């Protein structure tokens, strides 16, 4: 018995699909632009005396001038103190940059994963790790903030996003990163979002 009949049909909104595709392309382009900027900035890092305190690229948002070293030291110490006050053991730092926080927090932890989309930054931190026994347990990944591939769910007690989210292309990307981060965070763990620029 052939009892076929049409019960429903869908007409895709081609304009909405085009907008979504354009939005995804825009996201990719923006992330790519930031990556290029940081690759170029970080590649100027060879002449640094204290490789664990490389503040290249930390510039005043208004003047474009480099931030004074003493201000940066105070900011780093305060940030590290805040994070260490939670007594972290298994840490994921998304956007570890040149290791300002990593080099100070990782020695106090059992596990420390650092990710950054800049290969130059990851290579720089990898070289730093090779010179310090207290950092030998650090695992580095060259990847974008939304890539959590190979990381166990509910493994980390602390996830750090410091001076990172203002470079995300939009709120959807931020929400995607946060959703994935929460999956990797142990119940009762800490998500540290720091140094968020105020655009108001």
Please give the residue ranges for each predicted region.
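AMP-dependent adenylate-forming
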Residues: 1-39, 98, 141, 146-151
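A short acidic, Gly/Pro-enriched loop at the edge of an enzyme's catalytic core
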Residues: 150-159
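Conserved SAM/SAH-binding beta-strand->alpha-helix loop
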Residues: 118-120
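Conserved SAM-binding loop
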Residues: 125-126
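A short glycine-rich, Lys/Arg-flanked "PGG" loop and its adjoining helix->strand segment in the class I
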Residues: 175-190
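Conserved alpha-helix/loop element of class I SAM-dependent methyltransferases that forms part
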Residues: 71-90
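Conserved SAM-binding loop of SAM-dependent methyltransferases across substrates and taxa
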Residues: 98-109
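Conserved SAM-binding motif I beta-strand of class I
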Residues: 111-116
């Amino acid at each position: 018995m052939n009892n076929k009949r049409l019960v429903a049909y869908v007409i895709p909104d081609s304009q909405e699909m085009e907008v979504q595709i354009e939005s995804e392309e825009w996201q990719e382009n923006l992330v790519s632009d930031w990556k290029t900027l940081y690759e170029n900035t970080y590649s100027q890092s060879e002449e640094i005396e204290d490789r664990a305190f490389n503040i290249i690229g930390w510039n005043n948002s208004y003047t474009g001038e480099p931030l004074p070293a003493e201000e940066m030291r105070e900011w780093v110490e305060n940030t590290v103190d805040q994070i260490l006050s939670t007594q972290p053991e298994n840490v994921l730092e998304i956007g570890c940059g040149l290791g300002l926080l990593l080099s100070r927090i990782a020695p106090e932890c059992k596990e420390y994963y650092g990710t950054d989309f800049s290969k130059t930054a990851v290579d720089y931190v990898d070289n730093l790790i090779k010179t310090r026994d207290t950092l030998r347990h650090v695992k580095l990944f060259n990847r974008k903030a939304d890539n959590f591939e190979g990381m166990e769910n509910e493994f980390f007690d602390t996830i750090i996003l410091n001076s990172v989210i203002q470079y995300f292309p939009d709120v959807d990307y931020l929400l995607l990163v946060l959703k994935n981060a929460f999956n990797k965070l142990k119940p009762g763990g800490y998500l540290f979002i720091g140094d968020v620029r105020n655009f108001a």
